[in-house]
Amino acid sequence: MAVSLWQQCIGRLQDELSAQQFSMWIRPLQAEMDGDTLVLYAPNRFVLDWVRDKYINIINQFFTEQMGNDAPKLRFDIGSRPSAKKPEPAPVAAVRVPNPQTKASVGTSFNTTEPVANTNHRSNINPTYQFDNFVEGKSNQLGKAAALQVAENPGGAYNPLFLYGGTGLGKTHLLHAVGNGIIKNNPNAKVVYMHSERFVQDMVKALQNNAIEEFKRYYRSVDALFIDDIQFFANKDRSQEEFFHTFNALLEGNHQIILTSDRYPKEIDGVEDRLKSRFGWGLTVAIEPPELETRVAILMRKAQESGINLPDEVAFFIAKRLRSNVRELEGALNRVIANANFTGRPITIDFVREALRDLLALQEKLVTIDNIQKTVAEYYKIKMADMLSKRRSRSVARPRQVAMALSKELTNQSLPEIGDAFGGRDHTTVLHACRKIAQLREESHDIKEDYANLIRTLSS
């Protein structure tokens, strides 16, 4: 009875939550009765904590509405429900493809004299990219959680997994981390990572060498295929055709696919609608630019790995001024470390100002409140005067709140200074706007997309 009630509760949650929230947090749960208690099994600690924190009140309220005082007790656990557990399957009879940088090779199904056969010696999974050294924050926690679940259960609920976001935000790191996780759990797994251009090149070589059937057999036999920057398939009709059939074959065999792009699937121009539709069959997750706390954590982790003692105030100084992506942060820190090693000077704020003066000057020039206001007004198609006016209609108030939140995140101005720039508003109005937009970014896919697009525009 209670398990049936849980199925009804799932229907309620599916109506109330966004498709991404439902796929991410509710779909992986399994339910089973234990006496008078309904046990919900989550695949890992992250999902368990999130559901218990965000959704337990909704679940309990539904149970009470349906059964009153007879509603079952609720308990959470990690793993699969006992009745669902099955004997471990035999290891996959497949070949792990070594990194091309290593000299070792294993048996192949291709004739290695053929150019296309090079695919047989390339997993390209970088062992240095692990979940343990991926710095997590609000901007990427959904992506990491999804990647962890795929690593634990490849070919399961999130297939395909589609990660999108700007350059240098950690999408590639997560791809490799998943690959390393899969190989750790099953050393025989055939996991292949590549850039989309490499897939195109391999197909062209196969056509030139009359080896297209071998090409098809290879790509359709892998246990997991990870393709970076799928947007480069744009306007390559033959490549899209071949990938379409490869995609279908892998999904039919429950083999994992992970794709990345710099934009939301439906916004990729030059890619067939049937492919874009399939990209959204599993789970689509945005990887956003890191917020201040995450940027600081990235700098501290990188400095620690380099054996450098980076003072907290210096990390905050850099993180507050360089905001666009992880790659830029790491590049800036590498420059600071190199300068410090060369000159023998201690790493202070004044030293960093000098070492990064060109980068800092460029950032300060690019991102101003005025620039943010103009960009947001143009994006939402409202007048600049409306941004500063007292109008409270949603069509004006929401863009104004977005612009205030962006001003807090992307500039070094204080809340009172931001308020002054928006028509002399009080700092509490700015604070409310920032909190409101932060809430909406979790609840509304459209606001989340708008905010990410605006950050990309302002940071480019």
From Swiss-Prot:
Write out the annotated subcellular location: Cytoplasm
**Annotated region described as Domain II, given as residue ranges:** 84-123
- Report residue spans for region: Domain I, interacts with DnaA modulators: 1-84
Q: Which GO terms describe its molecular function?
A: ATP binding; ATP hydrolysis activity; DNA replication origin binding; lipid binding
Question: What does its UniProt record remark on the domains?
Answer: Domain I is involved in oligomerization and binding regulators, domain II is flexibile and of varying length in different bacteria, domain III forms the AAA+ region, while domain IV binds dsDNA.
Xref: CDD domains: AAA, Bac_DnaA_C
Q: What is this protein called?
A: Chromosomal replication initiator protein DnaA
Could you confirm whether the keyword Amino-acid biosynthesis appears in this record?
no
Function comment? Plays an essential role in the initiation and regulation of chromosomal replication. ATP-DnaA binds to the origin of replication (oriC) to initiate formation of the DNA replication initiation complex once per cell cycle. Binds the DnaA box (a 9 base pair repeat at the origin) and separates the double-stranded (ds)DNA. Forms a right-handed helical filament on oriC DNA; dsDNA binds to the exterior of the filament while single-stranded (ss)DNA is stabiized in the filament's interior.
UniProt lineage? Bacteria, Pseudomonadati, Pseudomonadota, Gammaproteobacteria, Alteromonadales
Q: Which Pfam families match?
A: Bac_DnaA, Bac_DnaA_C, DnaA_N, Hda_lid
